A protein has these predicted regions:
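Mature catalytic core of soluble alpha/beta enzymes
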Residues: 4-8, 12, 23-340
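Short amphipathic, basic-aromatic surface patches that mediate peripheral association
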Residues: 345-357
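Short coil-to-beta strand junction motifs in C2/discoidin
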Residues: 356-362, 436
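Beta-strand signatures of extracellular beta-sandwich domains
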Residues: 363-367
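Glycine-centered tight-turn motifs at strand-turn-strand junctions
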Residues: 385-428
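Short acidic/polar inter-strand loop motif in beta-rich domains
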Residues: 412-414, 427-432, 444-452
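A short tyrosine-centered beta-strand micro-motif
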Residues: 418-420, 432-442
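Short beta-strand elements
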Residues: 450-483
């Protein structure tokens, strides 16, 4: 008989082995998955982790045969090849239904009915000859007018002159379904992450209950060795990005975006890129695409109106605009302290006596002590001709990225007192350390004067607050305080 100590040691080693197997984090990397790469991590017992890997790959392969517009043997390609009513699989019917929901939500700016336009641009790339604007407008008009009936289980007829292209949300849908397959195959799993080409769904929390730390790449031109714009902390959330630089059509020597204007059929120019966090990858994928064609202000309003959604939008030149929930996702960074309270700036548009009064164009922003911009808070006035009459603001923001500025600018305001708040973050949503800054206000009026105020503040321990300044002509009283 073995000594009792030896037996206890054997039991201890066996238990450690079993616990180690249960806590094992299996990782899988595959290239050439949906035309890009796949990375899967699953915290589960070894046998379940292997089963989950197989389930993920099988589900991706199955849905690729359903949703791909690049495969002649896919269900989508067969549906596009005929105008006769066809019975559709549950997945294709679901995806087309989601496309229609997003088309309605964005008033047509997001559309899966533009397959004929994508096909025409593919032909242009192969021939080296650009399509005519009129030809594209005809195809775009047909896509915009398309009516798709998916209300019941009856066969579906494809509208004539319309081809479906579901790429704008298909990858997100596949990620969600593949993650569900992994969870079913590994019921003991405690955490799963599935990343396909940079779009990903993170289930539960990373090891030891910590949030998944996910770097946000510059969607305008992602590079493998590029530092992250930010790091977000995700728990059972998905993330997706949409940009214009890395995909598209090359006709002759010129590169065109793969994201097409739904009204003209022409590739988007000077358009923003976006990164979206949502509860599921399908929504994140669809909204990221939508934000790439929507005016920036409208896109931010849409993101803020949707529950559990946050977005970071980058203009064509890199100016950042974040939705209300974005800052809360940012992972804490060493050495940074969030300003404990917001600063409130009450500003006045003065009442002037004038035979032909025009409300002033006005910009209000936060700057470093040297004048370099930190955070753009307000732009009033939507015509570029008069925005240029704000020279301080124009040099720092407007002239480099006018399309983006026009996307967030609001109408001018009549005389009165108004308020704007600053949450202590920069244009990308990153928390800034307490210290000295400047509140910059500039106003100009058509047929009137111009005025610029620069008020020093110190957010460290509230020194010097509240403070106020008084303009002499186009700007009235300015008061800066904590709420």
């Amino acid at each position: 008989m073995k000594p009792i100590s030896t037996l206890l040691l054997a039991i201890f080693v066996t238990l450690c082995t079993l616990l180690g197997a249960a806590a094992r984090a299996a990782e899988l990397h595959r290239d050439d998955v949906l035309g890009t790469s796949l990375d899967l991590r699953i915290d589960a017992p070894a046998d379940q982790a292997m089963a989950a890997e197989r389930a993920v790959l099988a589900e991706i392969a199955r849905l690729d045969v359903v949703l791909s517009r690049w495969r002649e043997d896919s269900e989508l390609s067969r549906f596009n090849a005929s105008v006769e009513p066809q019975d559709l699989s549950r997945d294709l019917r679901t995806v087309l239904g989601l496309c229609e929901e997003w088309r309605a939500r964005t008033e047509g700016l997001f559309s899966c009915c533009m397959g004929a336009l994508a096909q025409r641009w593919q032909q242009a790339q192969e021939s080296g000859l650009l399509p005519t604007r009129e030809e594209l407008r005809v195809l775009a008009s047909a896509a915009a007018a398309a009516e798709v009936s998916l209300d019941d289980s009856r066969p579906v007829a494809r509208p004539q002159a319309v081809l479906f292209d579901v790429d704008a949300l298909a990858k997100g849908y596949i990620i969600d379904r593949a993650l569900a397959a992994a969870r079913a195959a590994a019921p003991a799993a405690t955490a799963i992450s599935l990343d396909i080409g940079g779009d990903a769904h993170y289930w539960q929390s990373s090891g030891a209950g910590e949030a998944w730390q996910v770097g946000v790449a510059d969607a305008r031109a992602p590079r493998d060795n590029q530092p992250a714009l930010a790091t977000v902390a995700l728990r059972s959330q998905a993330i997706a990005s949409s940009g214009h630089a890395t995909r598209g059509y090359t006709v002759g020597r010129r590169h065109y975006s793969h994201i097409l204007d739904p009204w003209s059929g022409w590739p988007m120019q000077f358009a923003p890129s976006a990164t979206v966090v949502a509860a599921d990858a399908t929504s994140a994928d669809a909204l990221a695409t939508a934000l790439s064609v929507m005016p920036i202000r409208s896109g931010l309003e849409l993101a803020d109106a949707m529950p559990k959604v946050a977005a970071l939008i980058l203009s064509d030149t890199g100016t950042a605009f974040s939705s209300q929930r974005w800052p809360a996702l940012l992972a804490a960074e060493a050495g940074q302290t969030v300003v404990p309270e917001q600063l409130v700036m009450d500003y006045e548009v003065p009442r002037l006596v004038s035979d032909r009064y025009h409300a002033p164009y006005l910009a209000l922003w936060i700057a470093h002590q040297d004048g370099s911009p930190v955070r753009q808070l307000l732009v009033l006035g939507e015509r570029s001709r008069y925005l240029q009459d704000l020279p301080q603001w124009w040099r720092r923001y407007g002239r480099d990225d006018l399309p983006a500025i026009q996307g967030i600018a609001r109408p001018t305001r009549m005389p009165g007192r108004y308020s704007v708040a600053w949450d202590g973050r920069d244009d990308r949503g990153q928390a800034l350390p307490p210290g000295p800054y400047r509140v910059q206000v500039e106003a100009a009026r058509q047929g009137g004067g111009h005025e610029f105020l620069s008020v020093p503040i110190d957010t460290g321990q509230g020194r010097g607050l509240p403070t106020q300044a008084q303009g002499s002509s186009e700007i009235g009283a300015l008061q800066i305080s904590r709420p």
